[in-house]
């Protein structure tokens, strides 16, 4: 289950970081996070929105949603619901995961991003970090449509070599990364893009 106590980080009186998940289900060759923090655990959706509402009442206007792979938010909630008849009661047990369609019994990260941006008093919403292989069009849609969501995408590339990316176990090619960035820029022409590059792997 998700920890009941989390560290609170404030960059300033107007900004706060909100942890939406812990752990990671990826197996990147250079990263020890899965070994030390375990599998991904998503924080309940309603709990997250409630925290942002409370922060807004305290005067916070800028939120950064934080996770090792924010785009996989809610995936574990789906696994908990698998094989269970989805009802209001069962949904509450896993943090209000709901059925948007027959194959998506969970809130997507884009749903959470939109809900946080709609909280009264919140003026800017950022997030970090997404994984290129899990970046969904719905997330870019929200960034393009919702003015409170900042038009900044930090998308770690790690390497421009497909051979190195394969050795890193990243799950995408350089061309696939470029395709995702191009699709994002098609919707958000002024998109600010930042990345991470590892030099000298391994």
Where would I find each of the regions flagged by the language model?
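Proteins enriched for Cys/Gly/acidic motifs involved in redox and nucleic-acid/cofactor modification
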Residues: 1-73, 82, 86, 108, ...
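Compositionally biased, low-structure terminal segments
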Residues: 3, 92-94, 110
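Alpha-helical interaction segments
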Residues: 7-8, 88, 99, 191
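Short, solvent-exposed loop/turn segments at secondary-structure junctions
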Residues: 72-74, 201-202
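Intrinsic disorder/low-complexity segments
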Residues: 80-106
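Conserved AdoMet/S-adenosylmethionine-binding subsite of the radical SAM
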Residues: 98-202
């Amino acid at each position: 289950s998700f920890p009941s106590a989390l560290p609170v980080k404030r960059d300033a009186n107007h900004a706060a970081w909100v942890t939406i998940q812990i752990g990671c289900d990826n197996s990147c060759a250079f990263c020890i996070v899965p070994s030390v923090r375990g599998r991904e655990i998503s924080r309940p959706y309603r709990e997250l929105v409630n925290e942002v509402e409370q922060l807004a009442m305290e005067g916070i206007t800028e939120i950064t949603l934080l996770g090792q792979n924010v785009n996989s938010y809610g995936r574990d909630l789906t696994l908990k619901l698998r094989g269970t008849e989805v009802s209001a009661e069962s949904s509450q047990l896993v943090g209000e995961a709901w059925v948007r369609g027959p194959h998506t019994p969970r809130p997507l990260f884009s749903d959470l991003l939109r809900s946080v941006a709609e909280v009264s008093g919140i003026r800017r919403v950022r997030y970090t970090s997404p994984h290129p292989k899990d970046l969904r069009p719905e997330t870019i849609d929200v960034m393009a449509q919702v003015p409170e969501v900042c038009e900044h995408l930090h998308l770690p590339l790690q390497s421009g070599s497909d051979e190195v990316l394969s050795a890193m176990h990243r799950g995408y090619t350089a061309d696939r990364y470029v395709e995702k960035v191009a699709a994002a820029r098609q919707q958000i022409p002024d998109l600010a893009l930042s990345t991470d590059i590892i030099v000298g792997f391994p």
